[in-house]
């Protein structure tokens, strides 16, 4: 690969003299050149295993694991050495004594209230982040000065310093073969942490860039700052000055930061009224342009206009939302309801934050989920991008309401005990130039990699340069902003695989060979960024959750950064959904139980997974949901209970329940469901879109901007006269089963049977025994089930219950007594009836009392009772249904009579003689 870098820019440092470097500052990177030449320079990457040459446009690739250094350079100069080298700084340093701010006041830093020092930083330093209204041209090395007024800054929260990074080798000895790469990666991470501590006052201060950049309000006026080193001139324009580019001209400092201070009006009112449209007018190498400020907090699209407009958002105190409820603690097992605000209405329209708060959140709580993951929060000008082509990273989407509406939604979720996770996009950015970050200052390599490396050819988007100091500030501050300002409880990071590899995971098959993860294709800069953002999240917000969307299976992904890992709490177990689609394209006879079990349990030791049978990806136009794969067009005509069912419907409903339960039961430590899929939402998602004319002349047909398939028909799941209702109630029972037993996070997991002949899978998780019979016709009487603990077992969940659209072939009052003797590598066993296409969960009943699971927090609903005791009843779900006639079923598909089980007699009857495999999974 060939990378060219046009120049270099140092981070903003209040303790530095002005730089006299004679080079272009349009590109920014952590990878600094080592020798300063007046005419040209080359620099060596300190992150990746290749060397970059900005003149020859060539790269030297190391055949070994060594980092190549050109002959005329060495790698002995650190970032700190370069920043402190007097040879590359100006001699005309100014200090901060008697410093007069642009608001006319004098300030000093009160060291008693502001130390900006983290663990491991013995000196500490005052940073630009603390000098909110300081002209960055007047910077000095002093940490305290004397003047007329004091600036009180809150003491920073403590983020633990880096550790040794060596524990990963104890956890996974296979990593030893790649120690050089991993130690190099950890060394880069430690170096950046140290430099952030030294020059920016620590990760806490560094991640509060929104207090310095963009619009900041003080008692005397408004300061606006923007990093745009490529711009030749800049001015702030908007409604407040009639869009006059000559009215409020900005000044540029030595580091490419443009600034202007607007004093209050004579009557004390702010110079820019709340709600005013604003943009930055720049003369750039690409021409004159008006851009939305990169740090804008709100943007809207005016009627009849295509580009968005930035909005100065600073409502009066009485209009600002005040959070009333504490954020919930992180649950042991996280059960996520993936959602999208705009398409959350049953009606064909764009829904609002307020409607979602009032209508959808109570539904999520009633279903038994404990977290809601919200997509498309960051502003995106193209609605059909599903929120993944972000244009304004700090602005919540105005399609759905105001920032205060979003805060109200999150506060209501917290009142209900729900975590709120944000689907955050830091993997790429919209390529829009008018209302996005692309070509912001007129240069190709501003926030992004220059040249082809900065473009994602499949997504048609721009790729961030994670080696840039200001990009790190921007993205880390962005994550901090959503947690701090809006009280989100964590993130699902989108497109992490694309970030971690220069090939972006495209046209690459990951086989599990470790060289695929720790080679030349690994983007170490991006991996280090993820380590930093996880440090930030877990250090400042210990209860927050970070989930990464990685399809590659990167080792160390969910191990702590102090141990050498990347630091996520969970990875998405993405292979499971693909496996189900693969199987649904086959005949039932071709399903292999061992294949299913292997896919579900193929997880890395000590690295937690959030598993799902399907997410929004499977619901998009061009794909199918599980329900549609299973039942197809029959869903249009045979889902009403007053109509006879069909074999396709019977099969589909049965397998839909089994697939979801075995996915939750065996696939991970967390579970995710996309809204509506709990009841088998029919059809696909298709956002409103018009006809598109591509540059190559091709035309992509639209859907006449229809919202018909961009909504969620929750009414289908609620209608007790439709078969969707039974599927929804089963999903609800699954969530409450996990809530009661916590089996997903239990350390005890044992797979005792995966029988290809019987099509039976049996496993233990916690004190539960799961029995799945995937056979399409065969039901088994007196089927022996191995177990660990002795005693009496009872049914606590039965997919064949009529409440869930089943045939009621099991006796829920039956008791199952264990008998001694090894079977399937278990010391005991009990006998059950295993009907075809059913999943049944048994719990040890002895000595355990049953208590109803109350749905509280303002959700009116009857409790769900899980039978965990001797005298308890099986699961009872509250439903709002009328009495319905018995459902006639196909004889070929089911057996209509219930076989009564003799559970006290130890007899082995009709089991087929097949090879039994047993397996322990950790």
UniProtKB/Swiss-Prot annotation:
Entries under CDD domains matching the protein: AmyAc_bac_euk_BE, E_set_GBE_euk_N
Swiss-Prot/TrEMBL keywords: Amyloplast, Chloroplast, Plastid, Transferase, Transit peptide
Broad class of the protein's primary localization: plastid
Pathway(s) where this gene product acts: Glycan biosynthesis; starch biosynthesis
Effect of inactivating the gene: Wrinkled seeds.
Superkingdom field: Eukaryota
GO BP terms in the entry: embryo development ending in seed dormancy; starch biosynthetic process
Biased composition (Low complexity): 897-922
Transit peptide endpoints, chain numbering: 1-47
Recorded GO CC terms: amyloplast; chloroplast
Enzyme Commission code(s) on record: 2.4.1.18
Tissue specificity field: Expressed in roots, leaves, stipules, pods and flowers.
Reactions performed catalytically: Transfers a segment of a (1->4)-alpha-D-glucan chain to a primary hydroxy group in a similar glucan chain
Basic and acidic residues bias locations: 99-109
Region (Disordered): 83-130, 870-922
Keyword flag Ubl conjugation: no
InterPro entries: A-amylase/branching_C (IPR006048), Glyco_hydro_13_cat_dom (IPR006047), Glyco_hydro_13_N (IPR004193), Glyco_hydro_b (IPR013780), Glycoside_hydrolase_SF (IPR017853), Ig-like_fold (IPR013783), Ig_E-set (IPR014756)
Protein function: Catalyzes the formation of the alpha-1,6-glucosidic linkages in starch by scission of a 1,4-alpha-linked oligosaccharide from growing alpha-1,4-glucan chains and the subsequent attachment of the oligosaccharide to the alpha-1,6 position. May preferentially transfer short chains during branching. Responsible for the synthesis of about 75% of the amylopectin found in the starch granules of mature embryos.
Subunit structure: Monomer.
Note: The wrinkled seeds phenotype (rr) studied by Mendel in 1866 is probably caused by an 800 bp insertion in the SBEI gene, leading to the loss of the last 61 amino acids of the protein and a complete absence of activity.
Sequence similarity: Belongs to the glycosyl hydrolase 13 family. GlgB subfamily.
This protein's name: 1,4-alpha-glucan-branching enzyme 1, chloroplastic/amyloplastic
């Amino acid at each position: 690969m060939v990378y060219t870098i046009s120049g270099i820019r140092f981070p903003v440092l209040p303790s530095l003299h002005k730089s006299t470097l004679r080079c272009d500052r349009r590109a920014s990177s952590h990878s600094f050149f080592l020798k300063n030449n007046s005419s040209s320079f080359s620099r060596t990457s300190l992150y990746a295993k290749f060397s970059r040459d900005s003149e020859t446009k060539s790269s030297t690739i190391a055949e070994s694991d060594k980092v190549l250094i050109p002959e005329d350079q060495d790698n002995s100069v650190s970032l700190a050495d370069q920043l402190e080298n007097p040879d590359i700084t100006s001699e005309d340093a100014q200090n901060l004594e008697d410093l007069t701010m642009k608001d006319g006041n004098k300030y000093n830093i009160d060291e008693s209230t502001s130390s900006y020092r983290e663990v491991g930083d013995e000196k500490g330093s005052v940073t630009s982040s603390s000098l909110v209204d300081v002209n960055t041209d007047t910077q000095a090395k002093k940490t305290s000065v004397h003047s007329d007024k004091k600036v009180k800054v809150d003491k920073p929260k403590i983020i633990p310093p880096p550790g040794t990074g060596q524990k990963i080798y104890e956890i996974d000895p296979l990593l030893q073969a790649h120690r050089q790469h991993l130690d190099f990666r950890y060394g880069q991470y430690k170096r950046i942490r140290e430099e952030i501590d030294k020059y920016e006052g620590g990760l806490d201060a560094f991640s509060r860039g929104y207090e310095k950049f963009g619009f900041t309000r003080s008692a005397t006026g408004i300061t606006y700052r923007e990093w745009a080193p490529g711009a030749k001139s800049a001015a702030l324009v908007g409604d407040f000055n009639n869009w006059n580019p000559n009215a409020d001209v900005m000044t540029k400092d030595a580091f490419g930061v443009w600034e202007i201070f607007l004093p209050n009006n004579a009557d004390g009112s702010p110079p820019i009224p709340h709600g005013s449209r604003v943009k930055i007018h720049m003369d750039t190498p690409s021409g004159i342009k008006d851009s939305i400020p990169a740090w804008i907090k709100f943007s809207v699209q005016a009627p009849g206009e295509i580009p968005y407009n930035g909005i100065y958002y600073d409502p009066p105190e009485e209009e600002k939302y005040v959070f009333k409820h504490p954020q919930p603690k992180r649950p042991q097992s996280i059960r996520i309801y993936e959602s999208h605000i705009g398409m959350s209405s049953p009606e064909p329209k764009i829904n609002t934050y307020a409607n979602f708060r009032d209508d959808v959140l109570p539904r999520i709580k009633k279903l038994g989920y404990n977290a809601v993951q919200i997509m498309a929060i960051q502003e995106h000008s193209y609605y059909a991008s599903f929120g993944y082509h972000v244009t304004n990273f700090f602005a919540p989407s105005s399609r759905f309401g105001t920032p205060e509406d979003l805060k109200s939604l999150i506060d209501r979720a917290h009142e209900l005990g729900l975590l709120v996770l944000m689907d955050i996009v830091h993997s790429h950015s919209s390529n829009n130039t008018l209302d996005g970050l692309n070509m912001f200052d007129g240069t190709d390599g501003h926030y992004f990699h220059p040249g082809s490396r900065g473009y994602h050819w499949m997504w048609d988007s721009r790729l961030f340069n994670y080696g840039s100091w200001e990009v790190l500030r921007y993205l880390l501050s962005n994550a901090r902003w959503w947690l701090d300002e809006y009280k989100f409880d964590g993130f699902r990071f989108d497109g992490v695989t694309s970030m971690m590899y220069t090939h972006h995971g495209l046209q690459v098959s990951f086989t599990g060979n470790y060289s695929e993860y720790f080679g030349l294709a690994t983007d170490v800069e991006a991996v280090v960024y993820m380590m930093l953002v996880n440090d930030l999240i877990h250090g400042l917000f210990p209860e927050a959750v970070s989930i990464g969307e990685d399809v590659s299976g990167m080792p160390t992904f969910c191990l702590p950064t102090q141990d050498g890992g990347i630091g996520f709490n969970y990875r998405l177990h993405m292979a499971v959904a693909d496996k189900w689609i693969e199987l649904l394209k086959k005949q039932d006879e071709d399903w292999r139980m061992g294949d299913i079990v292997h896919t579900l349990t193929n997880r890395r030791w000590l690295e937690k997974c959030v598993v799902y049978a399907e997410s929004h990806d499977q619901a998009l136009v061009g794909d199918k949901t599980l329900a549609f794969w299973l039942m197809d067009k029959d869903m249009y005509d045979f889902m009403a209970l007053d109509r006879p069912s069909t074999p396709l419907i019977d099969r589909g409903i049965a397998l839909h329940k089994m697939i979801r339960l075995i996915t939750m039961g065996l696939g991970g430590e967390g579970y995710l469901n996309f809204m509506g899929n709990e009841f088998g939402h029919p059809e696909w998602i298709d956002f409103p879109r018009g006809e598109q004319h591509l540059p190559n002349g091709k035309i992509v047909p639209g859907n006449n901007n229809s919202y018909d398939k961009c909504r969620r028909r929750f009414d289908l799941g609620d209608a007790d006269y439709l078969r969707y209702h039974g599927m929804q109630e089963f999903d609800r029972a699954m969530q409450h089963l996990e809530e009661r037993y916590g089996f997903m996070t239990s350390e005890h997991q044992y797979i005792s049977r995966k029988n290809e002949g019987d099509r039976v899978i049996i496993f233990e998780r916690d004190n539960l025994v799961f029995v799945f019979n995937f056979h399409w016709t065969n039901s088994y009487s007196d089927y022996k089930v191995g177990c660990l603990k002795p005693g009496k077992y009872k049914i606590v969940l039965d997919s064949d219950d009529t409440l869930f659209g089943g045939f009621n072939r099991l006796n829920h009052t039956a008791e199952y007594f264990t008998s001694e003797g090894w079977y399937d590598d278990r010391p005991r066993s009990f006998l059950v009836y295993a009907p075809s296409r059913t999943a049944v969960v048994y719990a040890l009943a002895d000595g355990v009392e049953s208590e109803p699971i109350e749905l509280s927090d303002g959700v009116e609903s009857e409790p769900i009772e899980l039978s965990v005791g001797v005298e308890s009843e099986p699961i009872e779900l509250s439903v709002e249904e009328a009495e319905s006639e018995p459902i006639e079923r196909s004889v070929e598909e089911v057996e209509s009579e219930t076989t009564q089980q003799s559970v006290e007699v130890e007899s082995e009857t009709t089991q087929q003689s097949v090879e039994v495999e047993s397996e322990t999974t950790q």
